[in-house]
Amino acid sequence: MAAVNLQASCSSGLASEDDANVGSQIGAAERLERPPRRQQQRNNYGSSNQDQPDAAILAVPNVVMREPCGSRPSRLTGGGGGSGGPPTNEMEEEQGLKYGAQHVIKLFVPVSLCMLVVVATINSISFYNSTDVYLLYTPFHEQSPEPSVKFWSALANSLILMSVVVVMTFLLIVLYKKRCYRIIHGWLILSSFMLLFIFTYLYLEELLRAYNIPMDYPTALLIMWNFGVVGMMSIHWQGPLRLQQGYLIFVAALMALVFIKYLPEWTAWAVLAAISIWDLIAVLSPRGPLRILVETAQERNEQIFPALIYSSTVVYALVNTVTPQQSQATASSSPSSSNSTTTTRATQNSLASPEAAAASGQRTGNSHPRQNQRDDGSVLATEGMPLVTFKSNLRGNAEAAGFTQEWSANLSERVARRQIEVQSTQSGNAQRSNEYRTVTAPDQNHPDGQEERGIKLGLGDFIFYSVLVGKASSYGDWTTTIACFVAILIGLCLTLLLLAIWRKALPALPISITFGLIFCFATSAVVKPFMEDLSAKQVFI
C-alpha cells in the first residue's frame, strides 16, 4: 500500500586512466577523458619546458568524470579555466529517466517472484483453495446463491476491512509523528514474528502434507527456529541485502496466501478495487497519511521502516567526507598545515584546472595555496606527502630506453596526474573533496553518511498484486492468470514512467490493479470462451 519512491541522485565515482602501471593501483576506477581543446596546450607546454621537467607537474588537465549510473560525463567545477558547471535540467531529467528505466528490471524480478510463489502454492496445495474459516473483519460470508446478496455482502465486508486499514494507517502516522519509534518497532516485530514462525509453520505443514514428505517434529522445529531468527535479524536489524529482500518477498507472498485463504470470493475482488482507491487518496491527497509519512521521513532524513518497504537499492556510503568547518579546525590546530588546503572546494579546484594549479594561489586567495614545491623537485600534496619525485637524468634514461621525445615530454604530467588520483582514492585522506564518492559496502558505524538510491515499493503492493494473480489462478484458467500477470507488470511500468517524469511519490496500486481487474474479467468472459470455441472447431489463428 505504500508509495513508490525514486531517489535518482547518482554518486560520482573517482576516475582514472588504465594505460600505465600506476593505473593498476586504482581499484574499480573510471576512465579519464582529456578534452580536445587541452591537447594543443599540453603539447605546447611540454615542448617549451623540456629543460624543466618538474614544471610540467603543475599542468594537470581538467578531469571529466563519468557517473556510475550510466549518465553523461560531467566536468568538475573548478577555478581558473574550468568550464564546467552544474548539470542542466535537461540532463537531470535524462539521467532520471535512464536511472528509472535501469531499475525497472530490478523491481520486476521481485514482483514476479512473489506472484510466482503464490501461483505455485495455489496450484499445488489445495489447503489455500478452500475457504471454511473467515477473518474477523468479514462477518458476511456470502453463503446465499443470489448474486445481489453476494454483491452487498462483499461491499459491506470490503468497507469494514477498509475501515480497519484506514484506522491502522492513521494510528501508524500519529505514532511516527510523535516519534514513538519503540511502539512502532514492537508492532512490526510482533507482526513479523507471527508471519515468520506461526504462519510459516502452517505453510510448511501443508507443503509437507501435499508432497507426502515425512518429517519429525524436532527437525521441523529446528528448521523453523533457524528460519525465523535469521528472518527477524535480516529484516529488523542487519543482514545481506539479498537475504533481506528474499525474506520480504516470502512474507508478502505468505500474507497474500492468507488473504486468498480467509477472504470470501467476492469480497476479495471488492477489497482489491477499494484498496486501489484508498491508495490513490492516501498518497496523492495533500493530507494523505502515506504522503505525510513519506514527507516526514524526508524532512527528518530517516529511513522508512524496512518491514514496510521493499528497496531495490544498495547503500552508497560516503568515505572520509570533510566539511569546511572540520578542515578549518584542523588547519588552526596544526601549525604545519598553514600551507595546506583548508576547504574541500579548494582541493577540488586544484585537481580540476591546470590554470589554477599553475597559479600561485591568487585566484582563491592566499589562504588556500594548493601545493608546496620543495627544492629537490618534488611536489607536496596537501597532507605534506610527496606526490612524485623526479631525478635530473629522467629524460636521458627514457631516450636511452627507446622512448620518443613526445612521450618523455608528457611523462611528468601523466605521472603527476595519476599520483593525484591514487592519493585521492586513499581512505585515509582527510582532505578529500566532498565531490568524490565511492561505492562501498554500508558502514554500520557511520549511518549518517549513507545515502540511498533506487526504487522503493511498499510490501502492501506486493501483497495485493499477488492476491489478484493468485485469485485468478484459483479458477484453474492459465489464460486469465497470464493476462493478469502481464497487466500488473504493464501497470507497474507505467507507474514507474510517471514516477520518473513527475519525481514524487506515487501510488503503485491503482494502475496495476485496474489493468489487472479489466484483463481478468475480460479474459474470463471474452477471450476464454472465444479460445474454447476455436479449439472445439479446430480453427487455428
UniProtKB/Swiss-Prot annotation:
Domain of life: Eukaryota
Motif, PAL: chain positions: 507-509
Example of a GO MF term: endopeptidase activity
Disordered: annotated segments: 1-52, 69-92, 327-379, 421-449
Reported tissue expression: Maternally expressed in nurse and follicle cells. In early embryos, expressed in all or most cells and later increases in CNS and epidermal tissues. In larvae, expression is seen in all imaginal disks, brain and optic lobes. In pupae, expression is seen in eye disk and brain.
Lumenal side: 128-154, 204-216, 264-265, 475-481
Membrane-side (Cytoplasmic) residue stretches: 1-106, 176-182, 238-242, 287-453, 503-506, 528-541
GO cellular component terms, A-Z: endoplasmic reticulum membrane; gamma-secretase complex; Golgi membrane
Ranges of compositional bias, category Polar residues: 1-14, 43-52, 361-370, 421-443
Region annotated Interaction with Mettl2, chain positions: 320-481
EC number: 3.4.23.-
Any one Gene Ontology BP term: Notch signaling pathway
Subunit (UniProt): Homodimer. Component of the gamma-secretase complex, a complex composed of a presenilin (Psn) homodimer, nicastrin (Nct), Aph-1 and Pen-2. Interacts with Mettl2. Isoform 2 shows a better interaction with Mettl2 than isoform 1.
Family as reported in the entry's similarity comment: Belongs to the peptidase A22A family.
Protein name: Presenilin homolog
Species in which this protein is naturally found: Drosophila melanogaster (Fruit fly)
Gene: Psn
